[in-house]
């Protein structure tokens, strides 16, 4: 019954998004993969209004300013806004960390990272900064840290090198574990919580274009409510989100999607409620946020 109610709520809110402003259709963009899960159960019913792009091209979505909403890394949106290259305000955080430390090593424990080589992905990114912070705060000191380009590359190393210790991300981790049952994984979020008390870090957010806020305020509010409901389904109805993600080609298959989604830490927290944690994450490496904390006007507040 709870799943049915959630499905009905998402459907009604999605319809409201379109109906609340006559003849106005909300459009949205997101990087394909885990961040796009926040939109999946909405987008599957109106795919023509949603664009899913490669993660490395998300800055171009801000530059083009075509979409009303964009899901993107929090720091990317903050940095572009500070530089005056974006008018998109942060409406809410939707992704709270999908990073995992993994290895095929027999009886692998986090303490095994001490004095060992660890391979991360995304050098000079906020994800890497958070991992290094979490390790340091928990007294874990690798002998060396090396970097590969992305989670797909560390996943490949995890599968081919039985001695490797890597940081990868969902859903790549689940796909790897389905191929090799010897893999053991630990959530970076657990280390982060031990160090900070926070349930994950502010990884990706929903951004809304200032022009749309001014021209279609009710449509904006309705869409944000729909996204919040969609995010909730990632916890309450994983099957629905998995089916939607596969139909939209966000994730490869239902089996991987169903197992990976719980580890993607998808949940909606509005801008004002998330601000404290956004600023905490930013202070780990302010250079990733343009050298300063986001200003007050970066945050969307419904009137």
Where are these regions (language model features)?
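Gram-positive cell-envelope targeting signals
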Residues: 1-25, 77, 131, 223, ...
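Short, glycine-/small- and polar/acidic-enriched structural segments
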Residues: 22-141, 145-147, 164, 170, ...
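Soluble non-cytosolic domains of exported or imported proteins
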Residues: 53, 71, 121-126, 148, ...
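Short acidic active-site motifs
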Residues: 57-58, 152-154
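Pocket-lining segment of extracytoplasmic ligand-binding domains
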Residues: 75, 153-244
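Short, solvent-exposed loop/beta-turn-alpha elements that line the ligand-binding surface or hinge
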Residues: 115, 190-199, 266-276
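Secondary-structure end/capping motifs
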Residues: 213-288
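Conserved C-terminal helix/tail region of periplasmic/extracytoplasmic solute-binding proteins
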Residues: 279-303
């Amino acid at each position: 019954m709870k799943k049915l109610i959630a499905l009905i709520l998402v459907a009604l809110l999605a319809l409201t998004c379109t109906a609340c402003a006559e003849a106005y259709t909300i459009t949205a963009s997101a990087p394909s993969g885990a961040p796009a899960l926040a939109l999946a159960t909405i987008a599957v019913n109106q795919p023509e209004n949603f664009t899913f792009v490669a993660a490395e091209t998300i800055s171009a979505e801000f530059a083009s300013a075509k979409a009303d909403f964009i899901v993107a890394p929090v720091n990317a949106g903050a940095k572009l806004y500070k530089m005056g290259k974006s008018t998109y305000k942060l409406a809410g955080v939707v992704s709270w960390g999908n990073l995992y430390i993994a290895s095929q090593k027999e009886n692998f424990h986090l303490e095994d990272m001490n004095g060992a080589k660890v391979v991360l992905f995304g050098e000079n990114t906020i994800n890497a900064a958070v991992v290094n912070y979490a390790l340091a705060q928990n007294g874990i000191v690798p002998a060396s840290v090396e970097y590969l380009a992305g989670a797909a590359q560390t996943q490949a190393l995890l599968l081919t090198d039985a001695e490797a210790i890597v940081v990868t991300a969902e859903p790549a981790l689940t796909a790897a574990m389905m191929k090799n049952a010897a893999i053991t994984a630990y959530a970076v979020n657990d280390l982060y919580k031990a160090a900070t008390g926070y349930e994950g870090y502010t990884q990706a957010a929903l951004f809304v274009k200032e022009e749309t806020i001014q021209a279609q305020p009710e449509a904006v509010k309705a869409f944000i409510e729909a996204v919040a409901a969609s995010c909730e389904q990632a916890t309450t109805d994983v099957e629905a989100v998995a089916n939607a993600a596969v139909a939209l080609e966000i994730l490869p298959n239902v089996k991987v999607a169903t197992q990976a989604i719980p580890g993607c830490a998808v949940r909606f927290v509005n801008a004002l409620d998330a601000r404290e944690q956004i600023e905490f994450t930013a202070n780990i490496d302010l250079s990733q946020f343009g050298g300063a904390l986001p200003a007050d006007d970066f945050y969307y507040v419904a009137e």
